[in-house]
Structure formats: C-alpha cells, structure tokens
C-alpha cells in the first residue's frame, strides 16, 4: 500500500486525480482479502494500478469507459508515472 500511496501523491502533484482505494472481497460472508489499488483519472483516461507481491505494478488502462489493456506490468514507480503521463498526453493532448 505504501508504494500506491507514493504513486497517488506524485500523480496528484502532476494534476491527475488519484487516490488509493480498498474494496473487500468476500466469498459468501467470509472476507477473503482486500483489493487495494490506486485509481487515477484525467479526462477520459483512467488507470487502476495494483502493487503485486512480486514487487511489480500492474496497470489497467481504460479510455472512455472502454478497457484498452489490463496486463501491463512495470517494475518501478518512475516507469508507472511515465506510462500514465505519456498516455494522458496522447489521449487527452
């Protein structure tokens, strides 16, 4: 969660709406786990980012409510910020 909070802070400093969210996952009435991710959005561009146990970031990119990709894995925070900002520039430029 620490890496996702850092990411959200950086993105907000760049003028991108970003926050870390937690959604519980249940099987019946039993809590299985918490789905913790960073949601970020600017215009019609949206990213959902998870920080995996393998120390990788998993990105899902949606444009105008259409999923574009959901299996991009990046190793570092700077790669994630670069991917998000360059994608926003391409689609919202």
Question: Model segments located where?
Answer:
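Negatively charged, low-complexity tracts enriched in Asp/Glu with abundant Ser/Thr
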Residues: 1-42, 66-71
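Short intrinsically disordered terminal tails
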Residues: 1-2, 89-93
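Intrinsically disordered, low-complexity regulatory segments enriched in Ser/Thr/Pro
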Residues: 42-79
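A short, charged, amphipathic alpha-helix used as a generic interaction element across diverse proteins
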Residues: 77-88
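Short non-domain terminal segments
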Residues: 24-25, 35-37, 45, 55, ...
């Amino acid at each position: 969660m620490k890496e996702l909070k850092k990411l959200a802070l950086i993105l907000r400093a760049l003028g991108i709406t970003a926050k870390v969210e937690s959604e519980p996952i249940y099987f019946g009435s039993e809590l299985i786990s918490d789905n913790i991710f960073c949601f970020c959005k600017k215009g019609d561009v949206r990213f959902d980012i998870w920080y995996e146990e393998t120390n990788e970031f998993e990105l899902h990119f949606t444009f105008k409510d259409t999923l574009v990709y959901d299996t991009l894995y990046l190793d570092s925070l700077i790669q994630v910020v670069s991917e998000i900002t360059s994608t926003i520039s391409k689609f919202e430029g």
